[in-house]
Amino acid sequence: MVVLLLVLYGGQTIAHAQQTIFNVPTTDVLDKGKVYFELDISAKPNDSDALNKFSSFVPHVVVGTGHNIEIGLNIAGNVQPGADSTTLVPVLKWRVYNGGDNGWAIVVGTHVFIPVHNKAYDVGNYTYTMVQKTFKTKTRVGFGSGFFTKDVVVPNAVRGVGQFTFEQPVTNKFTIASDWYTGKHANGYWTSGGIYKVTKKLTAYSGYSVGNANASKGNDFLLVEIGYNFN
């Protein structure tokens, strides 16, 4: 759960987990009583024309509540160097359709952004719909759309986005994966990399994010995520 990603232009990050690929939500939902924790680390070691060096740490927790619903909390805005822009992000995802053997699934979700320090806005929101199809080859592709309210990812503007995912298991433990938010805004990145199941409970994600804007000027960074299923 980036992406969600780096706080840019007053924007905030969104949830990550295999409740996301890297940044874009999946149609996966935790079973009732299941608890998942993840720490997302974004970093750029050098300055560039488009993006200066930084590091960012975003913890979040997700809990399955039953009835194909999960809830969670992200703590975004911990970016160095820079002013503290801590933002609490309660999240909710509801799987409204699970086709089982036909491979189709649909979720709807929402994230509420509540800035705590150095506020660029009082409260923001991201709502989305995501559709995924799993094929007999275990390939899973997804597409959907989302909407960010004013100031969340662009100053003084709202943003509608397209969102896309791709996953292909290579072994029982390793999957190549990619996701993408369309548009020029704080979450407008394409991220590709791998997902490795270290143990039954521990999963590692590693990817590289390239911006939709100013990619040739160095708008890119490394993303590493560590996820743990408690039960």
Regions found by a protein language model. Give the residues of each.
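Bacterial N-terminal signal peptides that target proteins for export
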Residues: 1-2
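C-terminal segment of classical bacterial N-terminal signal peptides
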Residues: 7-15
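Transmembrane beta-barrel domains of Gram-negative outer membranes and organellar outer membranes
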Residues: 15-139, 143-152, 167-175, 179-231
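Charged helix-capping and loop-helix junction motifs
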Residues: 123-126, 158-162
